[in-house]
Amino acid sequence: MSDTAPVSVPPVLPKSDLNFVWLDCEMTGLDPEKDRLLEIAVVVTGPELEPRVEGPVFAIHQSDALLDGMDAWNKGTHGRSGLIEKVRASTVTEAEAEQAILEFLARYVRKGVAPMCGNSIGQDRRFLVRYMPKLEAFFHYRNVDVSTLKELSRRWKPEVYASFKKAQKHTALADVHESIEELAHYRKHLLVP
């Protein structure tokens, strides 16, 4: 037995009602009534968008019939990214991914406090309502949707809109990080006095 007390290391990001929870899903299509989740990723940031704490990223198993039924855009995009093969190889269910993400988020925010953050996040929320209702209910009803600032800058400050270039990787984790970077861009160039 050691005679020195263990050193308590503070978390990189303390639990706070001001933390942001960023989320992105990749889906088989846009209709939650017939399409399904393929991948989900979460990142938690402090209120200043730093530090970033990556949460779990899950490729969610779906049937071959569902994957084969995707339209050409989804087959091409998710085929090129390697996501289709990850989904086929995965054994993770939507319920298992949901539970693991809830356990991760509970370390950083209280239930019902954090807005859901991302790009066109309303679409992700629609899928969560259907396939991960406990996770959707963990969030506050408000959203921080970066696409709102994108649309406003396109109309009010086209040079700000044009100066942010997206990589368009269409993987959940890459898209989450890109959304955070895009909000930081608009914060610096659009939301200025």
UniProtKB/Swiss-Prot annotation:
GO terms for cellular component: cytoplasm. Keywords: Cytoplasm, Exonuclease, Hydrolase, Nuclease. GO terms for biological process: DNA metabolic process. Its EC number is 3.1.15.-. The active site is at 141. Residues 20-183 form the Exonuclease domain. Gene3D superfamilies: Ribonuclease H-like superfamily/Ribonuclease H. It is an enzyme of class 3 (hydrolase). InterPro entries: Exonuclease_RNaseT/DNA_pol3 (IPR013520), Oligoribonuclease (IPR022894), RNaseH-like_sf (IPR012337), RNaseH_sf (IPR036397). Belongs to the oligoribonuclease family. This is Oligoribonuclease.
